[in-house]
Amino acid sequence: MSERRVAMDLPSGSNASMPLQRHRVSSLRGTRSPSSLDSPPASRTSAVGSLVRAPGVYVGVAPSGGIGGLGARVTRRALGISSVFLQGLRSSGLATAPAPGPERNHATAEDLGGCLVEYMTKVHALEQVSQELETQLRAHLESKAKRSGGWDALRASWASSYQQVGEAVLENARLMLQMETIQAGADDFKERYENEQPFRKAAEEEVSSLYKVIDEANLTKTDLEHQIESLKEELGSLSRSYEEDVKVLYKQLAGSELEQTDVPMGTGLDDVLETIRVQWERDVEKNRAEAGAVLQAKQQTEVVHVSQTQEEKLAAALSVELHDTSRQVQSLQAETESLRALKRGLENTLHDAKHWHDMELQNLGAVVGRLEAELAEIHSETEQQQQERAHLLACKGQLQKDVASYHALLDREESN
């Protein structure tokens, strides 16, 4: 009996490949309808005996309700019958006295029907006991809750505590967000400060170089002022010497007189004319010498005046050049400051652009990482589904092989 399989032919509308064990619980939970399994042994024997077929061992159509409606070829494992139960069945008088041929199969079917009826009776009794215990337990819990005065006060305190905890969690999250924002701002300012340090050093170096240029310009200015003072002193000394020379010349011209001749004049006309000619030539030579001296003094005066004019022009040109140089230095300083401001603005713009670019790259990287994680998860799910499908196909093939082997075994038994 342990080596034999018992098959049942149920209505064609039911699934022929579904095991009975899978739907046993659902069928037992429903309301049982009257069936031949709940009927007396005599009627059950007649119902089973009317549906027996030869030469195989088959159990006919079961009534609706109970285990009816589940058409399947079942084994003792599918029926949930333990080996102990079957051992007890084998130890009974019905199993020890098998009848040959159809009578043996009929007796085996009757024994199996009786075992199933007893099993169903025990199951329904256990279900009723379980329902009664559940009802008693529920009533006990309700009475205990009523005696304790209800859960409204505790529920209200629990709700208030839950609300306070939720508010505290939200406040903590808000504070954490503020701290993260402040920390991010501090890190940003620190990074900007560190980035501005090289530019600050470069600006300080430029300012120090400009201070050196200004010091050199001040030294040049002082030197030029000293040169102008020395030129003014030299010009004053030249003008004083010129005035003294002019005064000496004026005195010389004012104190000069005609020289008297000591030569006696003759009495004749020729002697008188000769004397006048000699005196005239002498006066002409004297006047020529005086005119030459005057012209030479005038030329010297003009040279001194010209040199004085050139020195004044040189001093004026130097002062104008100094003024232009200072003005150019001031304009260069203003232009340098404007260029520094422009440079700082461009550097800040570049830094902001780099910062936003890095933020965009980080956001895109996070999105790409999330998409890659989702893609990997989808791949893993797909592989898992493929493995499950392969496993199900393998199980299907194995079940088909088992069914074929069962059919072959039953056919061999029928042929025997």
Curated annotation (Swiss-Prot):
Protein name: Phakinin
Taxonomic lineage from the root: Eukaryota, Metazoa, Chordata, Craniata, Vertebrata
Region (Head): 2-115
Bilayer topology term: Peripheral membrane protein
Residue positions where N-acetylserine is found in the record: S2
Tissue localization of expression: Expressed in the deep and shallow cortices of the retina lens (at protein level).
Assembly notes: Part of a complex required for lens intermediate filament formation composed of BFSP1, BFSP2, and CRYAA. Found in a complex composed of PPL (via C-terminal linker domain), BFSP1 and BFSP2 in the retinal lens. Within the complex interacts with PPL (via C-terminal linker domain) and with BFSP1. Identified in a complex that contains VIM, EZR, AHNAK, BFSP1, BFSP2, ANK2, PLEC, PRX and spectrin. Interacts with LGSN. Interacts with VIM.
Function: Required for the correct formation of lens intermediate filaments as part of a complex composed of BFSP1, BFSP2 and CRYAA. Plays a role in maintenance of retinal lens optical clarity.
Gene this chain is encoded by: Bfsp2
Family, similarity comment: Belongs to the intermediate filament family.
GO biological process: one example: cell maturation
Stretches the record annotates as Disordered: 1-48
Ranges of residues in domain IF rod: 105-416
Residue numbers spanned by region Tail: 397-416
Main subcellular localisation: membrane
Source organism of the structure: Rattus norvegicus (Rat)
The keyword Acetylation appears for this protein: yes
PANTHER family from the UniProt entry: INTERMEDIATE FILAMENT, PHAKININ
